[in-house]
Amino acid sequence: MAVEPSGKLIVFSAPSGAGKTTIATMVLQRIANLSFSVSATTRKQREGEQDGVNYYFLDKATFEKKIEQGGFIEHEFFFGNYYGTLLDATESVLASGKNLLLDVDVKGALNVRKLFGERSLLIFIQPPSMEVLIERLQGRGSEDDAALQERLERARFEMSFADQFDTIIVNNNLTAAVDDVEAAIVNFIG
């Protein structure tokens, strides 16, 4: 008989440029019993990255086999590579009593809700406006016009799902957004 996991899942979704990664990093420093979920990917390992720390690096055939076997909570194909959250790694962390923070797209977040129900808290990080989002993405200087337009289309798509999340945090002020996210998580995990 399986032991019921005691940890909970906190799921972050946001359009690129909304500040999700920054908020997640700050919240992880503030909440002791919260770990960051390590995703699996088929992208090439970059210098300085460690397997099992930054990502679980899998080849395409292994990743696709795990998809067929139901080995992912969620997965997506994005910019030529697979990314996903491994079911066994997630269950292992939850069974240890730790809470887990996942950074996934909106469809992945909704799938987490289907699988984990009330043991999951879905938080959507939203930019104050599309204009601010455009400024943030342009400020990165890492996107050409075509890539920027693609990210903006994806942002509009992702923002259309925000009302299906438990909490929407508008990142107009980083300190306030981090405080609001922390309060929502602490309230949820007890």
Swiss-Prot record:
Domain Guanylate kinase-like: residue ranges: 7-186
Domain of life: Bacteria
Record-linked PROSITE patterns: GUANYLATE_KINASE_1, GUANYLATE_KINASE_2
Main location, first listed in the record: cytoplasm
Molecular-function GO terms, alphabetical: ATP binding; guanylate kinase activity
Binding site for ATP: 14-21
Cellular location(s): Cytoplasm
GO cellular component terms, A-Z: cytosol
Keywords, ordered alphabetically: ATP-binding, Cytoplasm, Kinase, Nucleotide-binding, Transferase
CDD domains listed in its UniProt record: GMPK
One Pfam family, short name: Guanylate_kin
EC number: 2.7.4.8
Catalytic activity, reaction form: GMP + ATP = GDP + ADP
Similarity annotation: Belongs to the guanylate kinase family.
Known role: Essential for recycling GMP and indirectly, cGMP.
The protein's name: Guanylate kinase
Gene name for this UniProt entry: gmk
